[in-house]
């Protein structure tokens, strides 16, 4: 058996998320079907392990999975073979032969997400699957002040949707930035941390655009840490604007080498 690490991108519009679900089209089920077809339907079937889930409508620029294949195929041939059978809304970027101890989920040391928010006065139907929409004027300086409050190790209880399966709401955000993409008239948020929980990025962005528009105090993030109340964060911005940008593994980022502690998963 050879273990392969696969980096892929996908348009999440027509997927019911990453994780396999009965009678629904998901990234995991689509990739699993193709991998097993390449291996001539082995018994037991090949199982795909992802770095984590993405929700329905969320996109990935570089999701990572691993699987064990019953015979050796050169990595680039594996990439070409997968791409020849995958649908048009998925593409394998890279395949690597890895040690049998590598695990796409448990070896993660950090993840980077991007959120794109269209700032047009009117909702653009051509962007509806790829951005959120915020028509109100924003003060980027206020957003950047609030972003600084999100960086560090904190209890993000107020920023996590109900249903999150985690032992604790404490996580560390290493970097949080926002800039305006002038060409596309979009706010672009980026977050890099050792782990993110259910809807966390989408809820944080909802708070940030409200701060930028002046409907929340600039340092309201600090108050939300204290109250630990999801309802007070209010808004969850649409899934369409969220992109999994990069998955880091131990050794890839010497500045932040430590994966999420077991007790925080």
Swiss-Prot record:
Residues spanning the signal sequence: none
Record: residues binding substrate: 113
Catalytic residues as annotated in Swiss-Prot or TrEMBL: 55 (nucleophile)
EC number: 5.4.99.12
Statement: the UniProt record of this protein carries the keyword tRNA processing: yes
HAMAP family tied to this protein: TruA (MF_00171)
Subunit structure: Homodimer.
Protein family: Belongs to the tRNA pseudouridine synthase TruA family.
Name under which the protein is recorded: tRNA pseudouridine synthase A
């Amino acid at each position: 058996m050879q273990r392969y690490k696969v980096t892929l991108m996908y348009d999440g519009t027509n997927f019911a998320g990453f994780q396999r679900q009965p009678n629904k089209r998901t990234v995991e089920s689509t990739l699993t079907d193709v991998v097993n077809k390449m291996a001539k339907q082995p018994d037991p079937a090949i199982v795909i392990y992802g770095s984590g889930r993405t929700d329905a409508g969320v996109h990935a620029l570089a999701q990572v999975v691993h699987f064990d294949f019953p015979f050796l195929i050169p990595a680039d041939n594996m990439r070409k073979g997968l791409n020849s059978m995958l649908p048009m809304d998925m593409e394998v970027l890279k395949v690597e032969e890895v040690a049998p101890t590598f695990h796409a989920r448990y070896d993660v040391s950090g993840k980077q997400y991007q959120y794109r928010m269209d700032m047009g006065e009117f909702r653009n139907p051509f962007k509806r699957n790829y951005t959120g929409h915020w028509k109100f004027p924003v003060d980027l300086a206020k957003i950047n002040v609030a972003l600084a409050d999100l960086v560090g190790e904190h209890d993000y209880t107020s920023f996590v949707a109900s249903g999150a399966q985690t032992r604790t709401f404490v996580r560390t955000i290493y970097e949080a930035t926002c800039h305006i993409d002038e060409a596309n008239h979009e706010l672009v948020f980026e977050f890099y941390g050792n782990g993110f929980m259910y809807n966390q990025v989408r809820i944080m962005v909802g708070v940030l655009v409200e701060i930028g528009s002046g409907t929340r105090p600039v340092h309201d993030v600090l108050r939300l840490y204290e109250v630990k109340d999801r309802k007070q964060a209010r808004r969850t911005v649409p899934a369409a604007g969220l992109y999994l940008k990069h998955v880091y593994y131990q050794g890839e980022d010497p500045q932040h080498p430590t994966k999420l502690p077991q007790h925080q998963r």
